[in-house]
Amino acid sequence: VLPQLAEQNAKIKTLTVEIPSLESVLAQNPDFVPAQLPLLLGPESKVARREDLATVGVNSYVSPGVCATKKATGDMYGSRQKLWDMTWLYQEISDFSRIFNVEDRGQALIADFKKREADLRQEFGKSKKDLSFVFWFSSASPSADAYVGGKNSASGFIASVLGGHNAITSETEWPTVSWESIIAANPDVIVVASL
């Protein structure tokens, strides 16, 4: 949590660190339930379908960026055939700012992100080398396969903004790959996420 958001974050009740039950969500008497993943609020959800919430008078929202993925067997995030881009984030910011009647703030945030992206592209676009990146998010153990950002994921987008490409070629949004595969890809940069 960013230091400037720590105080606000401390006021938010955590229902679970994984997947909440529908009962635990409804016990909060929500007016609105957003979700990033269809797994949490979709047709095959482990929590509820949007129709279930509508039946009890609760409005809901599912992130449009994740909804754009194609379902892949055994992967809750699916696969993405086209490189993720900021359009998805801008749509979500615009939607939330409209829902919460703060459209001016939403548009200001979008403008700030667009400027920051343009500045990064200008700075890193000068590079003469097409750097290859691997974005490592976690592993079950130090010797286990790596959970990484897939070719067309947001990680692939970040690599493109930095003037390079994702060394992982899988279209799966968040594939698990062997360290041998990573070594064979011979990335110039390995980004280690702190989750």
Residue ranges, per PLM feature:
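Acidic/histidine-enriched, beta-strand-rich ligand/metal-binding domains
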Residues: 11, 169-181, 185, 189-195
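Alpha-helical, coiled-coil/dimerization segments enriched in small aliphatic residues
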Residues: 147-174
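Short hydrophobic/charged patches on amphipathic alpha-helices used for structural packing
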Residues: 22-26, 156, 179-180
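Short, structured coil segments at secondary-structure junctions
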Residues: 8, 55-57, 162-163
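Extracytoplasmic substrate-binding proteins
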Residues: 49-142
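A short, structured surface patch at a secondary-structure boundary
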Residues: 1-43, 170
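A ligand-binding cleft/hinge motif common to bilobed small-molecule-binding domains
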Residues: 40-52, 194-195
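Structural recognition of the beta-strand scaffold that forms the well-ordered cores
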Residues: 32-36, 60-63, 131-137, 157, ...
